[in-house]
Amino acid sequence: MNIDSNIIKNENLINANNHTDRRDVHDSLAEAPEKITELKKNHWEELLPSSSNWYCTSVADCNENQIYIYACKSNVSIFNIKSKKFIGELNGHTDRVTSVGFFKRFESKNDESYKWCITGSDDKTVRIWKFNSNDDDHNEDTEIGDDFKHGSGGGGSDGGGGDDVNNFYGNKSSNFCIYYHQEHKAGVTCVVASPLVPDLVLSGDKAGALVIYRTLTNHVFPIPPIIGNNISISTLAFSPNHSDLVAIGYLNGIVLIYNFVIRSTVCKISAHSADVLSIVWFDSTIIQKNNIFHDNNINDQDDNNSNHRNRIFLATCSKDKAIKIWKQVGEKIESGFTNIYQFNPSKYSIQHSSSSGGGGINQNDKQRVWLTLSWSPESPQYLLSNSLTADVLIWDLINFKSPPEKFQSSHQRLIFNITQIPNSDGSLAKTTATTETTTKNKIKNKDKKQSQIKLNNKVITVSLDRQIIIWENLKAKIKIQGLGGFVYSIDTCSYSPNTFAIGCGDNTIRLWSPTENSKDAYESKTLWKGIQSKVTSLSICKDYGFSNSNLIAFGMDDGRVGVYNINTNQSKIFPGGHKNEIYEIIWKPPPTPTPQKNINNNNNNNNNNNNNNNNNNNNNNNNNNNNNNNNNNNNINNNNNNNSNNEQQPNKLYSIGNNEIYEWDYNDFNKSFTNMTPIIQQLNPKETFSKHKTDINFNLNGDMISIGYSDGTIDIFTSEFLFLTRIREHKKLINRVQWNHFKENEMILASASTDKKVIIYKLSKIGNQNENEKKIDNEKGKENENEKGKENENENENENENENENENENEIENIVNNNNENDTEIEIKNINKNENVDKEEMVENNNNNNIKYKIEILHQFIGHKNNVCSVSWSNVDPNLLGSASADGTVQVWNIKSKEAISNMRGHDGRVFTVCWSLLDPNLLVSGGEDQTVRLWNYSTQPFKTVTESQIKKSPQPELSISLNKKITEQQQQQQQPQSPIKSNPDQSNNPSLVPPILLTSVTSTSNTTATATTITQITESLPKKRPIFLLNKDIVQRQDSSQYVVPLAKYFTTNDQDSINTNETKQEYEFGSNSENNNSKIEAIFSEKKEIINKLVQKESLELLKIDDVENYISLNSWNPANLKQALYQVIKNGKLTGNIVSLSIQAGREIFESICNLYSQQLICIGDYHLAVSYLLMIGKVNEAIEVYRNTLLFQEAIILAKSRFLPDDPIINKLFTEWAKQTETSHPIHSIKCYLATINDQSLNSKQELLKLLSSVQTKQIIKIQSDLEQILK
């Protein structure tokens, strides 16, 4: 068989039938979703990635440049093995990516297709991506370039590319989709590129369809290799020796050897009893050269025959827990295959104790069984597979009976994919020679221990435990712990400044130290014990000294609260909890000495601080001279707190969920929560509070609490929840409130809201200090006067309330001053509830009528395009604030200069949390919906705001051309840009972004001119129709049609008189391009002869029939009713009837129309659409046949109602249906059966009474026993 010639012939046939060149391909471009064509540029320093997708047969792949890709959610992550860095992502699919693969390198081809990869998804599309790893120089000693080092190209592609659309293929930092097709009708399960044909891609789906994709011409061919039930394709494997063969694995256990060039089945193997999960097609040349399988005594008598060199060997594995080796039986593939050996991985599956949660594997549970295979030509003697637990096994193909060698244990759960990394030099010959020598040595020393096994390749595995492990010499060298859920919360602590605690949606807390271990920056510790739900909020106990910094309080999605002890790796869960998820959880700071109020100079401040320190401890004396440096000042404050609280233990926790604040006692885990809402109202009876609380935060000293609400208000309380003041600036829900960490800015508060704003407030205390001091001195030790002071205070409060009765509702609006106007004072209510404070402060609290608050808005930061989910103050610079938003970006603001100084882009989805690093003042981390945590350097970002330098557009990916069926109008509409996952907040304000149908409704009430303009816009936006004529299409745009002009002019200007003189007649002109002589030609469409037009229509209709475009085939033949009857016959013959064709068949006459309806109803019955089949039968008056359809399909209810609506009540068919329905339900529903018999009791021919009595005596249920006697009496 000449394989190459067959491919060439097939390709020529395709081109002959479709006359499509590259120019035509560009005319059929479909706009891809916006996220596919965006060239994003990410500059993250490190990335904690999302884990791979589970239970997919081709979830990962690696190329010769050691670029590793794997599918995660709807994206593909790219990892450079040489530099040990994640270098980008491919974003564009709208559903889970199920399969990925690389194009193969062809040394003889001068192209860059080996830099392309292919992906298949549950969104029914196959996409081809171009990316660049900056390894074109193949220098292994150099790191990745700066542009690609920090994830350039992630998010679909790179923002640095696309400056020149014509040169985008040469952009080294761009990842984007260049081709795609939508030919699959079900989710794609497997994609694979041919190792022998550079532009050939095959893909299979859940419906059993195989799609051949030729990227050079951008053509696709959908093929169903087999027809039947349970024919979902699970895996594909190209032949390494035959360019026209592919092995197809199905969920029903069948392996099919298929010739996709001639579209025929070569051989069918009943390989397994369950899903085929992996197929390895061994390279026959390498197998023969290295004597693989030779020493197992499996060869036939004709082994010496030269044809044996072409024998095919396969390996398959399945959910039936078997790995089988197959060998071709005869000299031809059509002879079939025989199973020469079966490996049993369950025999070597040892249960592992899980260190990452989730328990072990039940080997008897087929839903949990997964096997995968890997074979490399560079180590041909060994076949790699996983066990049924978590091991990687090495099977010796020379000695089948030897036990497999195991990789050192590192995974804890099922392994989904094993990938062997090819040599970077791509030199197969050299590697093969080395392997051959090793193989011969192995044959001589078969009895030696298997520990001498040496693989020439590195190996990468992905597992259910969310780990990606890179192996060398059977040992785990690099471990990458992926995230399996949304990242909801991140926190860090000064006692472990290089570690971030991450609350994740996969029921775990991760401890990640990206700056601690440069060799393994992706290793993280997983805390999972006792966590049984998503961790939506967490807080490290950072204010109670080093001994308590190992405590992490966390709130979960199910409303429960717990504390995790890192040292003991155990968690404790409080009883009870919120009804819904917890938004925020915090530790109550320890009580700290409160400094004297209203201090005007630094000398007084130092004196008072010294006095306070003398009362508690003397460790603060050395800290008052270091106030110039912000970083030192922050560390001093932390040290002061730590030194003064060494003996204190954490006490209280506060959580917000279900719009309530709960207090938890850390010292009593058996105690349930305390609902603070009624307590707050009891402490502040004269205030009205919103019912829906969303966030809570303590200030630096712990003496003030801020609480946010869903209506946009913020309430400020004392540490004992005594109301101080209220802020009303936001118009929507408050997501986060955060006090500044620095002493000099301790009264500055930031808030984030769903109104897309970040607002900075400053609270200032004002009042007459000298008078207050005098009052304190005069009232010391005078208890009676204190009581009088209380009475006077209450009187003053009443007077103030009467005077300001009309101002209380809008007090914040009156005091907020954005334009340096006169500040308004707020009086603090005086309620003494704190019995632990000293006498001096108690007196002050009772006599602080002159202490008032001034609240001013420092700035409103407006720039985010969606909800602001989180804010975080810098730990080094008191003026820097980071914010995370649902627009997918992280923003850094400067409250001093009131500017946006950096915008970090790269997340694919909403960003839920942001946290600053304590080690590097320029670093901060963020996490969100894309299940990743990214470490950013805000000082190196190219953008300052969200709107700056809008993301550049890459060239639109080309949509493939279907050569097997028509692209219907509905499919063309589906090819229009899809809505991205993230909503665009500017659409409501930008009419150009509103869909055309919305513009119609908006402008329908406008004048006629506006309406006409809108209709024009809608018409222009409709999908372009493909011409019905295939051979004669685009006649207007032909560039080489000038040769037809002169003959056409002579044709139309020649009359009978002229023909006598010139001896030219119109008959001498040939029509079309198939002239047999050298006469001048004109196109057939300009002919005046009907027979030529009829030939043209006939020729075009045959072309439509060849590609199964039956809709246009019938439409074309309906132009001439004489041809319609024969056209309908052809459609019926091919079984391609549709509803549209049936409706058009009326033109052929009533008799033919009725026959077509009857045939179409039978077709509908075969596919299970009984109701529509009945409708077509009723259309032609066949009521009895319609009832019979329901009767045969046991749809008695429909049949009876249809019969009663069309026939008389005493029609015999009705009683017959009731009787059959009664017999059908005698066992399952005897009561209903009795009712059906009673409905036919008067029909003597049916013996219903006898059948009913027999039923009553045979079926004895409680219900029948109750009515049996009554029924028997009535019937007698």
Curated annotation (Swiss-Prot):
Domain of life (superkingdom): Eukaryota
Biased composition (Low complexity): 598-646
Compositionally biased intervals (Acidic residues): 794-809
Annotated site location: Interaction with U4 snRNA: R368, R413, R466, F486, W528, K579, K732
Keyword Metal-binding part of the UniProt annotation: no
A GO MF term: mRNA 3'-UTR binding
InterPro entries: Beta-prop_GEMI5_1st (IPR056432), Gemin-5 (IPR052640), TPR_GEMI5 (IPR056421), WD40/YVTN_repeat-like_dom_sf (IPR015943), WD40_repeat_CS (IPR019775), WD40_repeat_dom_sf (IPR036322), WD40_rpt (IPR001680)
Feature: compositional bias, Polar residues: 979-992
Main location: nucleus
Gene3D superfamilies in UniProt: YVTN repeat-like/Quinoprotein amine dehydrogenase
Family annotation (Pfam families): Beta-prop_RIG_1st (PF23770), TPR_GEMI5 (PF23774), WD40 (PF00400)
Site (Interaction with U4 snRNA and with the 7-methylguanosine cap of RNA molecules): Y583, R910
Basic and acidic residues: bias regions: 772-793
Ranges of the WD repeats in the UniProt entry: 92-139, 183-223, 228-268, 271-336, 364-405, 438-481, 485-522, 530-574, 688-727, 729-771, 863-903, 906-946
Cited PANTHER family: GEM-ASSOCIATED PROTEIN 5
Role according to the record: The SMN complex catalyzes the assembly of small nuclear ribonucleoproteins (snRNPs), the building blocks of the spliceosome, and thereby plays an important role in the splicing of cellular pre-mRNAs. Most spliceosomal snRNPs contain a common set of Sm proteins SNRPB, SNRPD1, SNRPD2, SNRPD3, SNRPE, SNRPF and SNRPG that assemble in a heptameric protein ring on the Sm site of the small nuclear RNA to form the core snRNP (Sm core).
Similarity comment: family membership: Belongs to the WD repeat gemin-5 family.
Protein name: Component of gems protein 5
Organism name: Dictyostelium discoideum (Social amoeba)
